[in-house]
Amino acid sequence: MLWAFNRPAKALPTMVHLGYTNCAVCHISPQGGGLLNAYGRSIDLAQSFRGGDYQPSTNKFVKWLSWDDRITQDVRNVTQGQLSTATDEPTIGTVRARFMYRNATELGKGWRLSAVVNGENRSVKRPNLSYEPPIQPEEVYLTSALVSYRPKSTLEFSAGRDPLPSGVNNPDLTTYIRARNKYGYYDAPVQLKMFWWGKHYQINPYAFGPSGTEPTGAKESGGGSLAEFYLLGKHTTTVLGVNTLHGEASTLHRTMVGPYLRLGLRSWGILAEHDITNRSLTASPTSFLQHASYAQLFWYPREWLLISAIGEQLQTQRPFQEHLIAGRFEVTSRFSNHITLGVTSRFQENMISSQFAPSVALQLALKTVQ
């Protein structure tokens, strides 16, 4: 069984819990999942066990490194120890460590350069499927390199290499909705995308092409669009959206439609997504459907403590028939804006072979704060 560590923090439940409808409130990039802006850094500290008011550093050397606050950057480390097993297989212990450097440089007049560089001791590829092979990663890997232009506060254009926009935008890229739809750790195609958002909506069309790291036959080009709408209510945050995508490679064509929901009710909330993907092989008339489902119920008993129960299901039609279900229970504690500790218990069951695969993991995430 393959299961890997998440990104360092559970930013998405925090966003929903606090009543924010989109990522642009706290993140430099409107796609989210990246560096925090000044307001986001204040929320990051306030929602931790340490608490307090965020104050940017006044150290002269730090100011020099940040080019007088034009550069936002951080260094992150996520280390995970995991014990996993499966039916008729031994227990395996693994330790994975990932280092990440992220940089966003404001050039003025709305222009921005950004990049993310990763290093790791053990790669975590998508499942090696005959019809959709994974990218073979290197020890040091560039997952994002973008030029962005924001002509107004609610409109941004970006070009370069980056993960594709996704619905729920779950930070765990090993979930079925991510790993089985080419949203893995190393899937970072070249793309041109637009973000346009307002109080009640966000529209995100995009076009993409191969980055050059894909296996032969899997160099995919295509386009898609993400659209979501916000239904605001008293003490309630409801976001309904859909992500559509069509991609073509020399060996495979695919079309995906994925409706999703983000619901927040004060201290608890729900994240849900169901992706339907139709794939057709170019060398034969074969086409087959895939259904991938994700649902997360989360609760904040304290601002710094997140408890989640997660359920997943994957069904793929013949000739590549699969039926997997998975469940997970997570407890994540944000001790400060530098330190996050998480404990996870997970199982996966193959409904065709009856193989049962449980695992437990302890994860420590560390980061610098500018």
Label each region the model flagged:
Residues 20-30:
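The canonical Cys-X-X-Cys-His
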Residues 220-317:
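Detector for outer-membrane/organellar transmembrane beta-barrel domains
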